[in-house]
C-alpha cells in the first residue's frame, strides 16, 4: 500500500468508527430520554436521596448505593443498547468515549460519568435532594419577557414604521 492508500484506508476506518460511535450516542439519547429510564432512575433516587448530605465526608452507606446504581442503571442501558446493536460492548464504548468526550452532549456525558465517577454520582444525588426540598436553582428572577411586536395601544402615528 502506498501512502495515499494508507491515508484513505485510515480515513475510511476512522469515519466508520466515528459513525458507529455517533449511532451509539444517538441510541443513548433515546434511552435516557425514554419514560421507562426516567422512571427507573427517579425511583432509585427517591429511594436513597435522603441518605446524601452535602459534606466533605462520605458515609459508608454511599458505597453500596453506588454499586447498586451501577448494576441497575448501567445494566439497563447496556441491555437496551444490545437490543438496538447486537454485539454491543459497553467496555469498548467506555474506552472510545474517553477519546470523544468533547463531542458528546453534556447531559449524556454527565450521566455516563455517574457510572465511573463517585463524586459525579454524589453530586447527582445532592442536586436531586435540593430539588426535592425546594432548594434547586431558581433562574426565574433572571428572566425578562419582552414583546417583539409593537403594542397596538400606542397612538397610530407611533405604531407605524417609517423609513
Swiss-Prot record:
Its main location: cytoplasm. InterPro entries: ARL2BP, BART_dom, BART_sf. The keyword Zinc does not apply. It is found in: Cytoplasm; Mitochondrion intermembrane space; Cytoplasm, Cytoskeleton, Microtubule organizing center, Centrosome; Nucleus. One of its GO terms (cellular component) is centrosome. GO terms for molecular function: transcription coactivator activity. Pfam families: ARL2_Bind_BART. GO terms for biological process: maintenance of protein location in nucleus; positive regulation of tyrosine phosphorylation of STAT protein. Keywords: Cell projection, Cilium, Cytoplasm, Cytoskeleton, Mitochondrion, Nucleus. Interacts with GTP bound ARL2 and ARL3; the complex ARL2-ARL2BP as well as ARL2BP alone, binds to SLC25A4/ANT1. Interaction with ARL2 may be required for cilia basal body localization. Interacts with STAT3; interaction is enhanced with ARL2. Found in a complex with ARL2BP, ARL2 and SLC25A6. Found in a complex with ARL2, ARL2BP and SLC25A4. Interacts with STAT2, STAT3 and STAT4. Belongs to the ARL2BP family. Together with ARL2, plays a role in the nuclear translocation, retention and transcriptional activity of STAT3. May play a role as an effector of ARL2. This is ADP-ribosylation factor-like protein 2-binding protein. It comes from Pongo abelii (Sumatran orangutan). The gene is ARL2BP.
